């Protein structure tokens, strides 16, 4: 009885072994192969001279390789086909792997590597394409495929590229996709880059100058071109941007004020600080109306941004006509510029001048014959613009007067010292 009781637990143990059979260990060879691949990826790229020697030796030994040679493109196990999707593209062969290197060069590079481990079935993972895919996930620097400069076709086709040093291959610029007919050296690339920077700077300065040229009328520009002055206008665009400059200037020429060529000539007395300070406060809206002038006042301009091209002495020595100093004739010309010439006779009969024009409201405009609400709204809007421009002009004159006073004080102190 006792012996039978002792046999039962022993039998139960053997029964458990039968119920749960022994299994083989998990295959961790793929992870080991990946770890070895990452370690190999930290090697530096071979130099051009070494690649050239290995290529020549590979070409010599290409015909002597028999069936006993080293096989690098074999893809034996189905596990590799399942776990490496980088080689299963439709363009690649069924059993081979995709690589950018020629077969002779790849064979010579494999000869420098240590002897293969027992995991020979994972050998096809050691090419450039799968290495880049695996190394990108782990963050280690991948061993990139040799560029077109190091390929044997490039060496045979361009023998002058051999004297380049090894530092050229490690240039900071990214490798360009080379074609068999196009090969740009570093100097040519630098010239193209400098040309791009020059054009970019020219385009920005052109856009700034076009903003100023939009405020000039076509009549004043024609008078500048006809005058034949040696000092050109600072608002003229570049020669290769002439068409766009003319187009933008013609769009804003109907509403911009006129000015004589005297105010558009560049004066060498103008300092850069005065030009920058005047350009901040003296920029009226681009839709400002045309300011008419009688024959005695054609050489004067009412807006202060025309003084950017003249000296501060000329700006203060001349009395610029503002809206408050308009005569009834100038008011009539202003109405003609707004296409409201049918009301010019009534304004001339009432002797409406500049100060009276600024005081007009809706009821006064109705009494002057502007029965159309659209015309009244147009006149009111233009009057607001005139008042704002006059206020800006007054502030600019005050600021320029203060600047001139400061300059005189500095010159006086400099003379004393």
Swiss-Prot record:
Coiled-coil residue windows: 375-416
Question: Pfam families under this entry?
Answer: SAM_2 (PF07647)
Q: Which GO terms describe its molecular function?
A: actin filament binding
- Alphabetic keyword roster: Coiled coil, Phosphoprotein
Q: Where is the composition biased (Basic and acidic residues)?
A: 159-173
| Signal sequence annotation | none
Q: Name one GO cellular component term.
A: postsynaptic density
Give the matching CDD domains: SAM_Neurabin-like
**In what ranges is there compositional bias, type Basic residues?**
40-49
Q: Where is the composition biased (Low complexity)?
A: 138-153, 244-260, 276-289
Q: Which Gene3D superfamilies match?
A: Transcription Factor, Ets-1
> Where does the source fall among the domains of life?
Eukaryota
Q: Which residues form the SAM domain?
A: 326-389
InterPro entries xref list: Neurabin-like, SAM, SAM/pointed_sf
Q: Which residues carry this modification: Phosphothreonine?
A: 283
Which residues are reported to carry the modification Phosphoserine? 84, 108, 173, 179, 279
Query: Which GO terms of type biological process are on file?
Result: actin filament organization; calcium-mediated signaling; neuron projection development
Q: Extract the ranges annotated as region (Disordered).
A: 37-306, 390-417
- Protein name in the entry: Sterile alpha motif domain-containing protein 14
* Origin species: Rattus norvegicus
